[in-house]
């Protein structure tokens, strides 16, 4: 793996190199000084100094920056006291603080070189921070920021309720996804997860604990949602719920024509009576697709399905679900049949299965366990996630799937539309300026140190895709963006940069929080970097 790690190390050290070349002297805190300073704090939890390596790893597995200490908070006051102590050290201190959820960041965004990493799952484990479900006319759940969504789901299902909007993978923390957006196949109807939050509890960069909502401290509320951790650490969230179904009809069909595929998707998300979950995938040069499906799905027509050949083709998979309860099975069958009759998929490729609601939502974890068993989970993940306007998605697809990725890819490719009206433009999330845009995710893995399975190969393809978008007016925005300079971030935010910067100076004026996003250097450093 040595060949795969070399460019990552260079990437992580880029900022330090810039400082050295610019003649800037960077004071690195002596560990004994850090220990003494932090040890004076009275905490419900504790600091540790021997698990720094674990806090310097993430899902992306391409960047490793060691912190000076890891905070295992036993209360919100622990988080606040720690941030407040760093704030009191002032501009001369290089100490920063990063909240780490389940470590699913892609390029060190949850890391803090020489700083403090807050292990948010420790906060969730504290008894006083338990998940609390409330029914009534406006059902909601109060959940710790460090709680995993899968645990939130288990708790809400006990009350026959569930959050409305999800991510595809549930073993992520509440605060982590709300700091980005949180998108899955329900977003066309309910918006991303950040559009389904009623209230937040936040520790700001000044060490203040603030409760905020649409009505109270609303500027901080909207700043933190999709705010990449720049304005505060989300320690608790109140999330809207809906009645949870017992079962899900899970459907997959294939298309050979991109235009037909996207037209059908757009038709479905525009309809009031439609499926509950709508996602699309691009499948490049895969053999035996339908045979693979047979392990979990059954074909509508086994004979036709057995004659279908996928070799050497670019195909498009539409994945759909309809929720139902056991006594509604007949009605569900009728509604599914009526909706499918309007679609123009390849008739021999209709596959379906019925699973529990929990089983469907936690589907990616099943794949995770298989990959872990094969040693293929903890490998580099050079992902690229784009938001593409509807007006340019065909131009994008022709170049990317017809030329750049025509031979192969090393992971799933997501492609599905969402409605802009379901996204709240008061949050910090940046999206294209069109009513319909597509989420396109290239979820690559790099299990090899060379060749097609390497980080270098995946990054080369990613760079070609981004370069095409930038040079041909595609109007894309990156989601989970891996930018490393403030210049890139300014271009990303565009006209919204001024608001983003104002909020930063208001809630985290010393740039203590989330240094791994590489947006605002610590206040003692030159802002030009």
Curated annotation (Swiss-Prot):
Pfam families assigned: Cytokin-bind, FAD_binding_4
Signal peptide stretch: 1-27
Catalytic activity: N(6)-dimethylallyladenine + A + H2O = 3-methyl-2-butenal + adenine + AH2
Single annotated GO MF: FAD binding
Cysteine disulfide links: none
Residues the record marks as carrying a glycan: 285, 419, 425
Entry-annotated residues carrying Pros-8alpha-FAD histidine: 104
Keyword Glycoprotein applies: yes
Highest taxon above the source species: Eukaryota
Stated name of the protein: Cytokinin dehydrogenase 4
Location of this chain's protein in the cell: Secreted, Extracellular space
PANTHER family: CYTOKININ DEHYDROGENASE 6, GULONOLACTONE OXIDASE
Family: Belongs to the oxygen-dependent FAD-linked oxidoreductase family.
Organism, scientific name: Oryza sativa subsp. japonica (Rice)
Keywords: FAD, Flavoprotein, Glycoprotein, Oxidoreductase, Secreted, Signal
GO cellular component: extracellular region
Catalytic class of the enzyme: oxidoreductase
EC number(s) given by UniProt: 1.5.99.12
Tissues where this protein is expressed: Expressed in inflorescence meristems.
Keyword rRNA processing assigned: no
Binding-site list for FAD: 99, 101, 103, 105, 109, 168, 173, 179, 183, 234, 479, 517
Its job: Catalyzes the oxidation of cytokinins, a family of N(6)-substituted adenine derivatives that are plant hormones, where the substituent is an isopentenyl group.
Subunit details: Monomer.
FAD-binding PCMH-type domain: residues covered: 63-244
Gene Ontology BP terms: cytokinin metabolic process
């Amino acid at each position: 793996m040595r060949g795969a790690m070399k460019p990552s190390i260079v990437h992580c050290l880029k900022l330090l190199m810039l400082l050295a070349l610019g003649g800037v002297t960077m004071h690195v805190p002596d560990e004994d000084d850090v220990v003494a300073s932090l040890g004076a704090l009275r905490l419900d939890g504790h600091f540790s100094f021997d698990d720094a390596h674990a806090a310097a790893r993430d899902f992306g597995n391409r960047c490793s920056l060691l912190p000076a200490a890891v905070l295992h908070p036993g209360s919100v006051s622990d988080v606040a006291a720690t941030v407040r102590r760093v704030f009191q050290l002032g501009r001369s201190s290089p100490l920063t603080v990063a909240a780490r959820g389940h470590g699913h960041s892609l390029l060190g965004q949850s890391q803090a070189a020489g700083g403090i990493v807050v292990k948010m799952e420790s906060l969730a484990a504290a008894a006083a921070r338990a998940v609390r479900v409330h029914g009534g006319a406006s059902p909601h759940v109060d959940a710790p920021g460090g709680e995993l969504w899968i645990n939130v789901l288990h708790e809400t299902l006990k009350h026959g309720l569930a959050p409305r909007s999800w991510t595809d993978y549930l073993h992520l923390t509440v605060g982590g996804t709300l700091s980005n957006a949180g998108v899955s196949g329900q977003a066309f109807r309910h918006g991303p997860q950040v559009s389904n939050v009623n209230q937040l509890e936040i520790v700001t960069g000044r060490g203040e604990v603030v409760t905020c909502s649409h009505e109270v401290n609303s500027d901080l509320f909207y700043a933190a949602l999709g705010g990449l951790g720049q304005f505060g650490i989300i320690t608790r969230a109140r999330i809207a719920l809906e009645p949870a179904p017992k079962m899900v009809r899970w459907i997959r069909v294939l298309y050979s024509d991109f235009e037909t595929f996207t037209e059908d998707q757009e038709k479905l998300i525009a309809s009031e009576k439609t499926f509950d979950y709508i996602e699309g995938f691009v499948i490049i040069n895969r053999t035996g697709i339908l045979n693979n499906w047979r392990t979990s799905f059954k074909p509508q027509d086994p004979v036709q399905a057995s004659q279908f050949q996928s070799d050497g083709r670019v195909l498009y998979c539409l994945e759909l679900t309809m929720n139902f309860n056991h006594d509604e099975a007949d009605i569900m069958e009728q509604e599914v049949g009526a909706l499918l009759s309007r679609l123009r998929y390849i008739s021999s490729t209709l596959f379906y299965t019925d699973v529990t609601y929990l089983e469907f939502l936690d589907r990616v974890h099943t794949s995770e366990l298989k990959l872990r068993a094969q040693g293929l989970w903890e490998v580099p993940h050079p992902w690229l996630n784009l938001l593409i306007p509807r007006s340019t998605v065909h131009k994008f697809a022709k170049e990317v799937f017809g030329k750049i990725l025509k031979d192969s890819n090393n992971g799933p490719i997501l492609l599905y539309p969402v409605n802009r009206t379901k996204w709240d433009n008061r949050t910090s999330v940046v999206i294209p300026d069109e009513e319909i845009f597509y989420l396109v995710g290239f979820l690559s893995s790099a299990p090899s140190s060379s060749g097609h399975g390497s980080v270098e190969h995946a990054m080369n393809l990613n760079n070609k895709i981004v370069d095409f978008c930038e040079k041909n007016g595609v109007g894309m925005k990156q989601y989970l963006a891996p930018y490393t300079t403030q210049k890139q971030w300014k271009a990303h935010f565009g006209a919204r940069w001024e608001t983003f910067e104002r909020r930063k100076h208001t809630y985290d004026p010393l740039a203590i929080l989330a240094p791994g996003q590489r947006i605002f250097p610590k206040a003692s450093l030159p802002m030009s970097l």
